[in-house]
């Protein structure tokens, strides 16, 4: 049995969690804050909670999940589309210096795929796909019983595939998969399809129209 702290870096919020790992994972605590354009400032807001857990539990390491592109070996983020201001941030080095624990970085979809494959619905399978749908959209691939991340850790970055020329913008690219199905894209689709926010029936009708359009383009 071991205790691990996890950092989840997202475009809308960042969170730190602690869990106990044996034959399964037990979540012991979680704390989240809004994501800002300052990586140092955002992580500082999670620092006190992390220190309290480090004092209370024999934590072995820190895991970090974040949308790509990133370099898991160097522990560095690159131009992550939904994290303006975080370009080229060396997040592993930053956390290791703060907390004096070994830290590991992984693409968020890859991290989810690994956990689901080892402990969840994918347990016992040799091939599976995990799709993340949050502020952005991505996927993690398990092929032949191993994580497949590609040459540059970007094998599952399906969110930027263009599906239509005039679709909603997904972080700079019109009509991308992420533009249609990411959190921001769905909101833009709802706005495009009409009107000001209304009651439940109006939102339901709008949602049905959106689903029909997505079905037409094969989503």
Would you name each region that the model predicts?
Residues 66-68, 158:
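Short, flexible segments with low predicted structural confidence
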Residues 2-8, 61-63, 128-132, 138-140:
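Short glycine-aspartate micro-motif
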Residues 40-47, 51, 60-62, 69-127:
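Glycine-rich phosphate-binding loop and adjoining helix at the ATP-binding site
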Residues 4-66, 73:
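Conserved phosphate-binding loops in N-terminal lobes of ATP-dependent enzymes
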Residues 17-20, 28-30, 36-42, 104-106, ...:
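Glycine/GP-enriched mid-protein hinge/lid loop-to-helix segment characteristic of carbohydrate kinases
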Residues 10, 67, 110, 134:
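Anionic group-transfer/hydrolysis microenvironments
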């Amino acid at each position: 049995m071991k205790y691990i702290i996890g950092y989840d870096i997202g475009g809308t919020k960042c969170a730190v969690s602690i869990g106990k790992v044996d034959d399964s994972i037990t979540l012991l605590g979680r704390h989240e804050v809004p994501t800002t354009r300052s990586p140092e400032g955002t992580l500082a807001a999670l620092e006190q909670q992390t220190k309290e857990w480090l004092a209370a539990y024999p934590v072995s390491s820190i895991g970090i999940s974040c949308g790509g592109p990133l370099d898991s070996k160097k522990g560095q983020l690159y131009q992550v589309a939904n994290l303006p201001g975080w370009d080229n941030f060396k997040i592993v080095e930053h956390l290791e210096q703060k907390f004096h624990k070994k830290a590991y970085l992984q693409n968020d979809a890859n991290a989810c795929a690994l956990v689901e494959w080892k402990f969840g619905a994918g347990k016992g399978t040799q091939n599976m796909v995990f799709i993340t749908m949050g502020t952005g959209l991505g996927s993690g691939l398990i092929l032949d019983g191993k994580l497949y991340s590609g040459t540059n850790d970007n094998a599952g970055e399906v969110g930027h595939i263009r599906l239509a020329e005039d679709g909603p913008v997904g972080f700079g690219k019109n009509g991308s998969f992420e533009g249609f199905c990411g959190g921001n894209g769905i909101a833009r689709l709802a706005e495009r399809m009409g009107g000001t926010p209304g009651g439940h029936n109006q939102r339901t009708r709008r949602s049905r129209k959106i689903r029909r359009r997505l079905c037409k383009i094969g989503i």
